[in-house]
Amino acid sequence: MILCIGDVLSLAELQQILSLIADAEFVDGALTAGWNARLVKNNRQMPKGSLQQRKIEEIILAALERNLLFQMAARPKLIHSILISCYEAGMSYGTHTDDALMLDRHQLMRTDISFTLFLSAPEDYDGGELKIESSEGEQAYKLPAGALILYPASTLHRVEPVTRGIRYAAVSWVQSLIRDPQEREILFDLQTVRQQMFQESGKTRHFDLISKVYANLLRKWAEL
């Protein structure tokens, strides 16, 4: 499932992040890529553990925690440290798939889901689209600042060359409580339906039954 979520960050949060970025130093982004992805990664990245990176991560994690749509779709068990990337004119990230396992904070995690949180307005740069390959073909994404895209970490994807301006984005990975993507989507759909049912009719017999199905599937599939 690929899902775009708008307004993950408030305007105040976005402005605070951009202010922190303006004061930050960036290093070669290839340093954090896998051995093969390193060959096609040409961007800059905020050093992990720097003061600005830690403050930005705190803002983003708080925003993700309160975002119901993100929580429903991702079912996060672990979230990798947030990477803040910078693409200037001529920079890109060629076709690659993310590492299946990543070591973060001395803990090995499985990458089920990738996400990109756009920090630059689309009109501030040309190029820089995130392109994701799937069985339905290739799709390009260039979202408003503060919007986020969730997509399977198993996909081939790339960032097109930036030809003007600067593209800032926050990137990370989720180990989900629900490993199987089809099971995650089933739970997402059920949760969406039961919320709609409750809004329209309240706590009815039908709502109770679908809530039972939802809870029992979550109990069956969750990996703690």
UniProtKB/Swiss-Prot annotation:
<dbReference type="InterPro" id="IPR044862">
    <property type="entry name" value="Pro_4_hyd_alph_FE2OG_OXY"/>
</dbReference>
<dbReference type="Pfam" id="PF18331">
    <property type="entry name" value="PKHD_C"/>
</dbReference>
<feature type="binding site">
    <location>
        <position position="98"/>
    </location>
    <ligand>
        <name>Fe cation</name>
    </ligand>
</feature>
<dbReference type="InterPro" id="IPR041097">
    <property type="entry name" value="PKHD_C"/>
</dbReference>
<keyword id="KW-0560">Oxidoreductase</keyword>
<dbReference type="InterPro" id="IPR005123">
    <property type="entry name" value="Oxoglu/Fe-dep_dioxygenase_dom"/>
</dbReference>
<dbReference type="InterPro" id="IPR006620">
    <property type="entry name" value="Pro_4_hyd_alph"/>
</dbReference>
<dbReference type="GO" id="GO:0005506">
    <property type="term" value="F:iron ion binding"/>
</dbReference>
<dbReference type="GO" id="GO:0006879">
    <property type="term" value="P:intracellular iron ion homeostasis"/>
</dbReference>
<feature type="binding site">
    <location>
        <position position="157"/>
    </location>
    <ligand>
        <name>Fe cation</name>
    </ligand>
</feature>
<feature type="binding site">
    <location>
        <position position="167"/>
    </location>
    <ligand>
        <name>2-oxoglutarate</name>
    </ligand>
</feature>
<dbReference type="GO" id="GO:0006974">
    <property type="term" value="P:DNA damage response"/>
</dbReference>
<keyword id="KW-0223">Dioxygenase</keyword>
<protein>
    <recommendedName>
        <fullName>PKHD-type hydroxylase CYB_2270</fullName>
        <ecNumber>1.14.11.-</ecNumber>
    </recommendedName>
</protein>
<dbReference type="GO" id="GO:0016706">
    <property type="term" value="F:2-oxoglutarate-dependent dioxygenase activity"/>
</dbReference>
<keyword id="KW-0408">Iron</keyword>
<feature type="binding site">
    <location>
        <position position="96"/>
    </location>
    <ligand>
        <name>Fe cation</name>
    </ligand>
</feature>
<feature type="domain" description="Fe2OG dioxygenase">
    <location>
        <begin position="78"/>
        <end position="176"/>
    </location>
</feature>
<dbReference type="GO" id="GO:0031418">
    <property type="term" value="F:L-ascorbic acid binding"/>
</dbReference>
<keyword id="KW-0479">Metal-binding</keyword>
<dbReference type="Pfam" id="PF13640">
    <property type="entry name" value="2OG-FeII_Oxy_3"/>
</dbReference>
<dbReference type="InterPro" id="IPR023550">
    <property type="entry name" value="PKHD_hydroxylase"/>
</dbReference>
<keyword id="KW-0847">Vitamin C</keyword>
